[in-house]
């Protein structure tokens, strides 16, 4: 099977750079599965898990809070607002963020506050979903 190069970067750091046999990303229109020689594409990504299968390694999970996905036949680049390796996600922190966001949604003072709270809630739920995926794999 062929491979392509993957770069996942956030404003803080490079999270992943290396070869992959396939990758699955949470694109705005739904999950996108990417194999070598994929048709070029540029799309936004939503909060969720990016799954990377590198040659001779177990599948790796990276949580992204949103950003952009660029696909070229031999390289995939994800520019994430925030990116965290799955193993580094903090469940207690994500649960607390979810609880805080739910309270903010209920107690909204303005439309802007409500939109921000909804975004925070969506991000916390996506983090918890990524943690659950890791647990199912036994990591």
Curated annotation (Swiss-Prot):
GO terms for cellular component: plasma membrane; proton-transporting ATP synthase complex. It holds the Pfam family ATP-synt_DE. It is a peripheral membrane protein. It is found in: Cell inner membrane. One of its GO terms (molecular function) is proton-transporting ATP synthase activity, rotational mechanism. Keywords: ATP synthesis, Cell inner membrane, Cell membrane, CF(1), Hydrogen ion transport, Ion transport, Membrane, Transport. Its main location: membrane. Transmembrane segments: none annotated. It comes from the Bacteria. InterPro entries: ATP_F1_dsu/esu_C_sf, ATP_synth_F1_dsu/esu, ATP_synth_F1_dsu/esu_N, ATP_synth_F1_esu_C, ATPsynth_dsu/esu_N. Belongs to the ATPase epsilon chain family. Produces ATP from ADP in the presence of a proton gradient across the membrane. F-type ATPases have 2 components, CF(1) - the catalytic core - and CF(0) - the membrane proton channel. CF(1) has five subunits: alpha(3), beta(3), gamma(1), delta(1), epsilon(1). CF(0) has three main subunits: a, b and c. This is ATP synthase epsilon chain.
